[in-house]
């Protein structure tokens, strides 16, 4: 018996997010500039931050350009064929591995049309393969492995190519979204909050919910899911490893702080890959359209902003010692335990409420059929997993200490300076503390991101559950931090 397609769902009222079109414009065109600023201002030429920025009375733009390594041919020097071809090759390799390596197929959540999309998951295999190749090259050639030296020498140009890529893919999916027709056999849908009618805002927030493309020899690729966990997350680990290699080329050693940050961030990423199917129930997949917001975040923001600490340490090494390492690992363990335990509890309850590990939990039965947990981890706060996620971010930044350094010319003979292999000397001097604006940015940003996500989720749940959600909020009063927020 044929299944009747659902009628078009009633349009849910959604206001603008991110301050509407002005916010969309600012994020889309100023965040890329901010990434450039971070990576120019904190550099391996003059210091972190560049010395001119600490001397406002004698500030000179020409001097600043020299200190940060601004290309001699200006903006044109921000791009290169080498950097662009590297980005193309990297993404083509990701697509090939996506197709040829073993994978599992999982159905996504039910769409408003009543259908379900199928997803092909093998990110763990493809990423492990890539890392194994890089590890083999490093074992054979050490820190001089061409991948590591190429990334250091073409760092800004690779960044530029990825920024351009994020703009191109955002524009492609936006234009293509106008071919979505109700009742189509491919289960294509528009995102509820992504077709406001404002071109800039819809391009930014994402007009189509799950844009897919058929690629010759590769097959169908879900663009949003593919970019969520593959090139950017993998790039984050690769970027960290390249800065560890740079530290070794600079000094002949790799500090415990660099190893710690690289290892714990890799653990975080591997956890995402290991639990790849769990992405199907996240807001990114079920609710948000795919536009510039997610494209830029996946392709550029994650690998280039999240690796700022290891880049800093490649120039100014910091040794934590046994006690420092123990403290950082303790924070990581606490955050990871909260994050994973809470998510596992929720997933077990959704899958099998009679599971002995969760059958004792109390809940509110909503009119929509869903159950809202009011005890256990989710009785402590509405997003206790966000607290664990945020705690995990602290050891990413804390190892940089009172960050900031100045790079002096060879032969300065400054007491206590770190001396690079090329003779240049690195001291903190008057830059001490100012570098924290860059190396601790992640903690601040991630906290704001999680608060914003919680607010968005709260609004979505209130629209979905109505008075049941209001009752739930009376029982579980805290949003993220139990008793505080």
Curated annotation (Swiss-Prot):
S-S bridge residues: none
GO biological process: ergosterol biosynthetic process
Reported phenotype of the disruption mutant: In contrast to the disruption of ERG24B, does not affect sensitivity to amine fungicides.
Transmembrane spans: 18-38, 77-97, 131-151, 155-175, 259-279, 285-305, 319-339, 431-451
First-listed, main subcellular location of the protein, grouped into a coarse class: endoplasmic reticulum
UniProt membrane topology term: Multi-pass membrane protein
Keywords assigned by UniProt, alphabetized: Endoplasmic reticulum, Glycoprotein, Lipid biosynthesis, Lipid metabolism, Membrane, Oxidoreductase, Steroid biosynthesis, Steroid metabolism, Sterol biosynthesis, Sterol metabolism, Transmembrane, Transmembrane helix
The protein's role, per its UniProt record: Delta(14)-sterol reductase; part of the third module of ergosterol biosynthesis pathway that includes the late steps of the pathway. Catalyzes the reduction of the C14=C15 double bond within 4,4,24-trimethyl ergosta-8,14,24(28)-trienolto produce 4,4-dimethylfecosterol. The third module or late pathway involves the ergosterol synthesis itself through consecutive reactions that mainly occur in the endoplasmic reticulum (ER) membrane. Firstly, the squalene synthase ERG9 catalyzes the condensation of 2 farnesyl pyrophosphate moieties to form squalene, which is the precursor of all steroids.
Entry similarity comment: Belongs to the ERG4/ERG24 family.
Protein name: Delta(14)-sterol reductase ERG24A
Native source organism of the sequence: Gibberella zeae (strain ATCC MYA-4620 / CBS 123657 / FGSC 9075 / NRRL 31084 / PH-1)
Lineage of the organism: Eukaryota, Fungi, Dikarya, Ascomycota, Pezizomycotina
Gene: ERG24A
């Amino acid at each position: 018996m044929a299944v009747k397609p659902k009628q078009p769902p009633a349009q849910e009222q959604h206001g603008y997010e991110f301050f509407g079109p002005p916010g969309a414009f600012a994020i889309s065109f100023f965040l890329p500039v901010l990434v450039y600023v971070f990576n120019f201002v904190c550099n391996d030429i003059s210091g972190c931050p560049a010395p001119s920025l600490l001397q406002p009375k004698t500030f000179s733009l020409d001097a600043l350009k020299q200190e940060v390594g601004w290309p001699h041919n200006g903006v044109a020097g921000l791009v290169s064929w080498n950097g662009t071809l590297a980005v193309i090759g990297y993404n083509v390799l990701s697509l090939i591995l996506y197709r040829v390596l073993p994978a599992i197929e999982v159905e996504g959540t039910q769409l408003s049309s009543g259908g379900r999309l199928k997803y092909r998951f093998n990110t763990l295999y493809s990423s492990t393969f890539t890392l194994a190749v890089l590890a083999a090259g490093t074992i054979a050639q050490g820190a001089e492995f061409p991948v590591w030296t190429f990334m250091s020498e073409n760092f800004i140009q690779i960044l530029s190519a990825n920024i351009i890529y994020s703009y191109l893919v955002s524009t492609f999916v936006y234009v293509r979204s106008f071919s979505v027709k109700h009742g189509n056999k491919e289960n294509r849908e528009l995102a509820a909050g992504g077709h406001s009618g404002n071109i800039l805002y819809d391009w930014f927030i994402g007009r189509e919910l799950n844009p897919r493309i058929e690629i010759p020899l590769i097959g169908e690729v879900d663009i949003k899911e593919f970019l969520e966990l593959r090139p950017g997350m993998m790039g984050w680990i690769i970027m960290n490893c390249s800065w560890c290699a740079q530290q070794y080329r600079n000094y002949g050693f790799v500090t415990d702080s660099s190893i710690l940050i690289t290892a714990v961030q890799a653990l975080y990423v591997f956890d995402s890959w290991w639990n790849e199917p769990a992405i199907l129930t996240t807001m990114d997949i079920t609710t948000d359209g795919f536009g510039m917001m997610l494209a830029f975040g996946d392709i550029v923001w994650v690998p280039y902003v999240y690796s700022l600490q290891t880049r800093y340490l490649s120039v100014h090494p910091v040794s934590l010692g046994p006690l420092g390492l123990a403290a950082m690992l303790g924070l990581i363990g606490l955050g990871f335990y909260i994050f994973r335990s809470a998510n596992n509890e929720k997933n077990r309850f959704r899958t099998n409420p009679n599971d002995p590990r969760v059958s004792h939990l109390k809940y509110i039965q909503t009119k929509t059929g869903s159950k809202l947990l009011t005890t256990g981890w989710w009785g402590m706060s509405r997003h206790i997993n966000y607290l664990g996620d945020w705690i995990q971010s602290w050891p990413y930044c804390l190892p940089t200490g009172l960050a900031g350094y100045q790079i002096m010319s060879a032969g300065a003979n400054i007491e206590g300076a770190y001396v690079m292999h090329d003779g240049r000397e690195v001291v903190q001097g008057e830059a001490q503390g100012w570098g924290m604006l860059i190396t601790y940015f992640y903690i601040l940003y991630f906290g704001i991101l999680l608060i914003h996500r919680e607010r968005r989720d709260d609004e979505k749940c209130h629209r979905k559950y109505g008075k049941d959600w209001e009752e739930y909020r009376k029982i579980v009063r805290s949003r993220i931090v139990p008793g505080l927020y």
